[in-house]
Structure formats: structure tokens, C-alpha cells
């Protein structure tokens, strides 16, 4: 159990670090995808507001381009392993410029929509739409205003104009726009007003969301997935038990260099057993000389057989039949 506790603790730490990395990556992908959606809306509505009329220019779509490119880099970098840090740093740089652009455009578009667009005469039905077959043709119209002299206004084709906002050749009341050229109807002016405020609100949302996204990507760019630790635990070797052990067999040299042993008694020796007198049952004799002479080999008995002995360095004689 003691040897398994460090490995279990290491596995738990690796699992925690891997889970934290995956959680950070999911958060990074979520905020960058959200920023990409917001930037797409900013670009779409900004382009719609810019192309709605000719004489009113809107720059609210620029932050959408910068924030969208930065969010795409963030999505790609969040799914990388090797070049993740470089890609996320580039994403943070673009998002930072997009945040600055969103702040500036939100102020400019908001101020422009609040101070230079007045829809009260349009809602009151005092604006007129002029359309001719010749687009470049200029027409003079007379604006009748109460308590003022009639004024002549030169307008182009496909123009929505409001005489209540025109001040007889001078700048309109508080710099308000009194004509909108290249529109299909006066209702396009209402759409332009709503689009401007929508782009302004989206730029404010993109401003704060870009700050949050840059912070999340900045905390995730230095994180790396933790590899599982390989723990090598040296276990004590167990004693080996040998079964069916064979006795040691002496080598061939032991038999070769040793003195030859005498063989046991042969059948011939047993036939002449009379040469060995039987011992008395009462015990051994007290006379050692007599006892020794009784075990001596008789002179008339044939000699015992013993194999010839040849030294190791001497060859045996050749065989003769």
C-alpha cells in the first residue's frame, strides 16, 4: 500500500491538471465563438447602414472586421498544441485593436444618430420623396414654411427631403440632415436610424466582450496539457524456490585421475569362503595377533582381480588376441 500511494497521488494530480486544461480550452472556445457571432452582427448591420443611403456614411462595421479576425485566430489557437501561444498572442493583439475601434465607433455612431438624425418630421408626414427617371437630374422644389418665406431646394432623384429641417440655404437646425439621397423611400431613413443604434449597441457589447475574451485567452495561452506521469516502483525480488534439484555429478576428470577402486567379492571368492573363519558368537578374541592372522589371504588362493591401471599420460598397450 505504501508503494501505491505516490502513484495514485500523481495520477490524481495529472487528472486534475488535464481537467483544468480542458475546462480552460472550452471557456476560450466559447468566448471566442461568442465574439465571432457579435462581430459578424456588427459587420452585417454596419454594412447595411452604410449602404442604406449615399450621403450618410457609417463606420461601425470596422470593429466587426478586426474583432472577427481576432476571434478566428483565437478559435484556431485554442485547438492547437504546438503553436498555441503564438496564435493566441496574435489573437489578443487583434482583439485589443478591435476593442479600441469598437469604443471609438460606438461613440461616433451614437452621437451621430442622436444629434444629426431627427425622425419627428418623418413620423409627422412632413417629408417628401422625389423620384425621376433620370438619376443625375437635379430638380428645384419649393419649401413652404409657416412664418417664413418660401425657399427653393435643389434635390436629386430618389431623395427623401424634409422642408421643416431646411433653413433656406443655411445649415439645417442644429446640423440636422434634411435630405437623404439614393433611397427607395422615406422608410429607408427609419431603417437607417434603427441600424445606427443597433450597431452602436453591438459595438458596446463587442467592447466588453473583447476585453473578457482577451483576458481569457491571456490566461490560457501559457497552459499546456499535462502528460500522465509514469511511476517506476522498484519491488523487492522474491526468493526463488528451486524444485527437483539434482545432486551434483562429479566430472569426468575426477574418475579419470582417481585411483581405481577394487571391485566387490566375486563368485570365486565366495566359493573359497573357508579361508575366512567364522567369528565366535561370544565376541572378538582378545589376542590381536591371532585375529589378524585369521583374516590374512591364504597363499594357495588365486589373486583377486583388479583392472589394470594406466597413468593419465601413458597409453594402454595394443590389443592382442
Curated annotation (Swiss-Prot):
Q: Which InterPro entries match?
A: TMEM255
Identify the stretch(es) annotated as Disordered. 279-300
The UniProt entry lists the main location of this chain as membrane
Localisation per UniProt entry? Membrane
Ranges that cross the membrane? 29-49, 56-76, 88-108, 200-220
Report how it sits in the membrane: Multi-pass membrane protein
Annotated Gene Ontology cellular components are:
membrane
The protein's UniProt keywords, in alphabetical order, are: Membrane, Transmembrane, Transmembrane helix
UniProt feature, compositional bias: Polar residues: 279-297
List, alphabetically, the Pfam families matched.
FAM70
Against PANTHER family, the record matches this protein to:
TRANSMEMBRANE PROTEIN 255A, TRANSMEMBRANE PROTEIN 255B-LIKE
Task: Report the family membership.
Answer: Belongs to the TMEM255 family.
Descriptive protein name: Transmembrane protein 255A
Q: What is the lineage of its organism?
A: Eukaryota, Metazoa, Chordata, Craniata, Vertebrata
Amino acid at each position: 500500500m505504501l508503494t501505491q500511494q505516490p502513484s495514485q497521488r500523481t495520477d490524481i494530480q495529472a487528472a486534475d491538471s488535464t481537467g483544468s486544461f480542458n475546462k480552460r480550452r472550452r471557456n476560450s472556445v466559447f468566448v471566442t465563438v461568442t465574439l465571432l457571432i457579435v462581430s459578424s452582427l456588427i459587420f452585417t448591420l454596419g454594412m447595411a447602414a452604410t449602404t442604406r443611403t449615399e450621403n450618410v456614411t457609417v463606420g461601425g462595421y470596422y470593429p466587426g472586421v478586426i474583432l472577427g479576425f481576432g476571434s478566428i485566430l483565437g478559435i484556431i489557437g485554442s485547438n492547437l498544441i504546438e503553436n498555441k501561444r503564438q496564435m493566441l498572442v496574435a489573437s489578443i493583439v487583434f482583439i485589443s485593436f478591435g476593442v479600441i475601434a469598437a469604443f471609438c465607433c460606438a461613440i461616433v455612431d451614437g452621437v451621430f444618430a442622436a444629434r444629426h438624425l431627427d425622425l419627428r418630421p418623418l413620423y409627422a408626414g412632413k417629408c417628401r420623396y422625389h423620384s425621376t427617371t433620370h438619376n443625375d437630374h437635379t430638380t428645384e422644389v419649393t419649401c413652404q414654411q409657416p412664418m417664413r418665406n418660401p425657399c427653393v431646394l435643389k434635390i436629386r432623384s430618389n431623395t427623401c427631403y424634409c422642408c421643416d429641417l431646411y433653413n433656406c440655404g443655411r445649415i439645417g437646425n442644429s446640423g440636422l440632415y434634411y435630405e437623404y439621397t439614393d433611397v427607395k423611400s422615406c422608410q429607408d431613413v427609419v431603417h437607417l436610424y434603427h441600424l445606427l443604434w443597433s450597431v452602436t449597441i453591438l459595438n458596446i457589447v463587442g467592447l466588453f466582450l473583447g476585453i473578457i475574451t482577451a483576458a481569457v485567452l491571456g490566461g490560457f495561452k501559457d497552459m499546456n496539457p499535462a502528460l500522465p506521469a509514469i511511476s517506476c516502483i522498484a519491488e523487492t525480488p522474491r526468493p526463488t524456490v528451486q524444485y527437483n534439484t539434482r545432486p551434483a555429478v562429479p566430472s569426468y576428470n575426477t574418475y579419470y585421475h582417481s585411483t581405481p577402486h577394487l571391485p566387490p567379492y566375486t563368485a570365486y571368492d565366495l566359493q573359497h569362503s573357508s579361508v575366512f573363519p567364522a567369528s565366535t558368537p561370544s565376541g572378538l578374541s582378545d589376542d590381536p595377533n591371532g585375529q589378524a592372522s585369521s583374516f590374512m589371504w591364504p597363499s594357495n588362493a588365486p589373486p583377486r582381480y583388479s583392472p589394470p591401471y594406466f597413468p593419465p599420460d601413458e597409453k594402454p598397450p595394443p590389443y592382442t588376441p
